[in-house]
Amino acid sequence: MSFSNQNYNVHTFIIMNQSIKFWPEQERPRERLLHSGPESLSDAELLAIFLRTGSKQHSAVELARLMIQHFGGLNPVFDASLQELSHFHGIGTTKYAHLMAVKELGRRYLNHYFHQDALNLNSSRLVLDYLRYELLGEKQEVFAVLCLDSELRKLNFKKLFYGSLNACNISINHTLRYALQQHACHIVIAHNHPFGKAEPSAADLDLTHQLYQACQLVEIKLLDHFIIAKDGTFSFAERALLSQKKCMHTDIDKPDLTGEDHHKKSCDRSP
C-alpha cells in the first residue's frame, strides 16, 4: 500500500468515527439527502439520520453500519427487540422508539397505498411489490389470489390456503370459484417460501399449468404465478412456464366448481 493510500484510509477512519457535525458538509448524510435526494444515500447513512447521534466510539453512520452488519440487513434492524439493540453502545429507549416509529409510519404508508380503491396494478413490478408486501412477513407457506378487472385494477386479494413451513394443499376449484365471485377478468396467483429459495418445485409447475388450463375454460386469464422468498422472487410468466407442458399432468377436465379438487403443494384452508 502506498503512503498516500495509508493517509487516505487514516483520514477516512477518523472522519467516520468522529461526530458527524465535524464532517465536511458535503459528506454529512442529511445535507447530501437534501442536495442529491434520499436515493443517493446508503442504508447506513439513511439509518444514521434517524439515529441522529452515535456513541463515544462511533459516529451515527458507523454505528448504523455496525448494526446492519450484525443483523444481516436493514430490515432485521427494524425487527430487532430493544434488548437486542441495546447491546450497541449509544442505543437506548429513545433511539429504539425512533426506529419503531419509523417502521410503523412506513407500514401505514404502504397499507394506505396498497389498499386504496381501484388500485392500478398494470405492470409486473407493481404487482410484485404488492405481493411482496402481503406475503413476505408470513411464517408459513401461503397461497394467495389477486383478482383484477379488465383494466388491471385490483378487485380483491385473499390468502386462500395456509400450510406448514414448506407445503400447502390447494384446491383449483375453490380458487376458481373465488375468482368468479369477484368477477375477475384476470388473476395473479402467488405463494411464499418462508425459509426456502424462490425456485419452483415439480408440484408448483404442475399446479400452475392445471390452473392455467382451468382459467381458460371459464374465460379468466392467469397473468402470472409468483413465488415470494426472502432471497428473491420467481415469475412463471417471465420464464414462459404458465402454459408450457413441463409438468406431470398436462390435461384436465372442465373444472367442477361445486367439487373439491385438491392439489398437493398440506394444510388447513383459511376461513
Swiss-Prot record:
Q: By its UniProt entry, which Pfam families does this protein fall under?
A: RadC, UPF0758_N
* GO terms of molecular function: metal ion binding; metallopeptidase activity
Work out whether the entry's keyword set contains NADP.
no
What positions does the record give for the motif labelled JAMM motif? Answer: 191-204
Which GO biological process annotations does it have?
proteolysis
Q: Where do the TM regions start and end?
A: none
Q: Where is the MPN domain?
A: 120-242
Keywords carried by this UniProt record? Hydrolase, Metal-binding, Metalloprotease, Protease, Zinc
User: Binding of Zn(2+): at which residues?
Assistant: H191, H193, D204
Highest taxon, organism lineage: Bacteria
Query: How far does the signal peptide extend, from start to end residue?
Result: none
PANTHER family xref list:
DNA REPAIR PROTEIN RADC (PTHR30471), UPF0758 PROTEIN YEES-RELATED (PTHR30471:SF3)
Similarity annotation:
Belongs to the UPF0758 family.
- What protein name does the entry list? UPF0758 protein ACIAD3126
The record lists the organism as Acinetobacter baylyi (strain ATCC 33305 / BD413 / ADP1)
Cite the source lineage: Bacteria, Pseudomonadati, Pseudomonadota, Gammaproteobacteria, Moraxellales
